[in-house]
Amino acid sequence: MIFKTQNINGYGENMEYLKIGDVWKEKYGEKVYKISLSAGCTCPNRDGTKGVGGCIFCSEKGSGDFAQSGFLPIAQQIEQAKKLVEKKGGKKFIAYFQSYTNTYGDVKRLEKIFTEAASMPEILELAIATRCDCLGEDVIQMLDRLNKIKPVTVELGLQSSNPETLKKINCCYTAEDFKKRVKLLKEHNIHVVAHIILGFPWESRDDMVQSAHFVAESGADGIKLQLLHYLKGTKMGEDYLKYNYPTMTLEEYATLLGDCLNALPAGMEIHRLTGDGAKKDLLAPLWTGDKRKTMNYISNYIKSLKDERRSL
């Protein structure tokens, strides 16, 4: 696989990267917490519209394992979510609609939910996770209206730029679909964060870095980099047990992250460098269950890269 030879970003020069927590703190003058909510949606590749079973890596909660229940009114969800972080001193929040596809459903119902969340003074912004094939003109117009009330970020799943991977994991969209929707959202001045997953067992390291290149070229404002978790109750988890798929070590993952950061423009916001699935459901890699140790190792590794390059 051939990559561009020029260095397209400042990360490659000194490995400084733009942490989203720092962006929010500078913007709002204090630490801002992201609280996970649900709009009570499903997905078109779960209900038969495009497919069944969902993406093979996705949990029964639609990758919203830490989100509040979608059966609760949004005000109640927010109050419950706030209690989880108020003990840390949290007073300002991003309302993150995380579970399933949060623009898939009746637009009037969704707009009512999002508007109610945006109307709360402690909610500074909305973050809405969705799929590129669930952003029709009516949804774009809704997001445009919401963006005039509070800043809106659309968190858009890419997962991989590899077409074979997208077929295997049952996403039911293409990388070009993703790129077209990023362009449309940016035309409406809506912030976009791309999600990619690293560690699919059939992908090479070059494939994974190419996904980061693809996001860099798509025009997205930010990125979430997520290591593949094999979870109980998912097709991916079943396949892991059946085929004994190899998993990355923490050391291997950290070096891969270094390569991915090197593929990104210096102004791109980094929203996540890894994730933590529900421990009770985690099959592998088990080291990801210790989030503090994982993040400390990754931070120290990236710092070592910065120190090494500064000494050259």
State the predicted function of each range.
Residues I2-D22, E30-Y33, G222, Y230-L312:
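Auxiliary Fe-S-binding modules of radical SAM enzymes
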Residues I2-I74, E79-I94:
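N-terminal [4Fe-4S]-dependent radical SAM core
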Residues Y33-L37, F93-A95, L126-I128, V152-L156, ...:
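Hydrophobic faces of well-ordered beta-strands that scaffold small-molecule active sites
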Residues K61-A81, V85-V107, E122-L135, P151-D177, ...:
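Core AdoMet radical
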Residues A81-L84, L135-I149, K179-K180, V209-G219, ...:
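Short amphipathic alpha-helices and their capping/turn segments at secondary-structure boundaries
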Residues V85-K87, F114-P121, Q141-P151, K183-E187, ...:
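Acidic (Asp/Glu)-rich catalytic clusters
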Residues E111-A117, D144, S204-D221, G277-S299:
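Short, electropositive alpha-helical surface patch
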Residues E176-K235, E251-T274:
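Conserved C-terminal portion of the radical SAM core fold
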